[in-house]
Design a protein with these regions (language model features):
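Hydrophobic alpha-helical segments that form the core
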Residues: 3-6, 110-113, 150-157, 167-191, ...
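Amphipathic alpha-helical linker/stalk segments
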Residues: 21, 79-105, 125
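Amphipathic, non-transmembrane alpha-helical scaffold segments
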Residues: 26, 34, 80, 84, ...
Length: 214
């Protein structure tokens, strides 16, 4: 371990954010750190990035950085949480658009699951960051998964009602179809790497859901 790693670890153990209600200025500074950290992680990778790198990119001192985040892991989780929040907002907007069930779900998948991942993967350290999310932010990933599944469930249920389809009479529920779709998308991401093939596979999964309520 390098001297810098020893110093960062010692500092991380002794440093804690101020225990008080956050102000609007605090929120703005936190967001500035999150934006800066994303740039740093994409440029250097998580392992090589330091708190000094993040503080410098955020245009603040290292002590000021520690007023808002305990350590690098805390910042990584904040970055992941912010990205998941944006992804959920985009999913909600896509599903609220006019169009068929398939068009709306495919739009959400394109925007949130394919395009976003491609943007991250296009960086030199994207693969490292995507791998780390499962070890450093597994609870956030699970929360995002459940939230998207719930959005898909509600969208499918609303479409079935509009069509006058009783899913229970077919041995199905909107929740089951939504989870099947999410599981299929997760498996697709593991075996298909390029975006065009992912879109094709995703559309086939959505088509299965559409046929279930036709």
């Amino acid at each position: 371990m390098s001297d810098n790693d020893h110093f960062e670890r010692a500092t991380d153990m002794d440093s804690h954010p101020v225990d008080r209600a956050p102000t609007q200025a605090d929120d703005c500074r936190r967001q500035r750190v999150i934006d800066a950290a994303m740039q740093v992680f994409l440029s250097y990778g998580y392992k090589r990035a330091t708190m000094d790198d993040i503080a410098r990119t955020a245009d603040m001192s290292r002590p000021a950085l520690y007023l808002h985040f305990k350590n690098k892991t805390d910042i990584f989780r904040a970055v992941a949480d912010h990205m998941f929040e944006l992804a959920l907002e985009s999913t909600s907007l896509s599903l609220a658009q006019n169009g068929s069930l398939a068009d709306r779900i495919n739009g959400a998948i394109d925007t949130v699951m394919i395009n976003l991942i491609c943007q991250i993967n296009s960086s030199a350290h994207g693969e490292e960051l995507l791998d780390l999310k499962n070890s450093l932010a597994a609870d956030l990933v699970a929360g995002w998964h459940n939230a998207v599944a719930a959005m898909f469930r509600d969208t499918i249920a609303a479409d079935a009602r509009q069509r006058g389809i009783d899913l229970s009479a077919r041995g199905l529920t909107a929740a089951t179809l939504a989870e099947m779709l999410m599981d299929g998308l997760e498996g697709m991401k593991r075996r298909v790497s390029d975006a065009d093939s992912q879109r094709k596979a995703a559309r086939q999964l959505v088509r299965i859901v559409e046929l279930a309520i036709a």
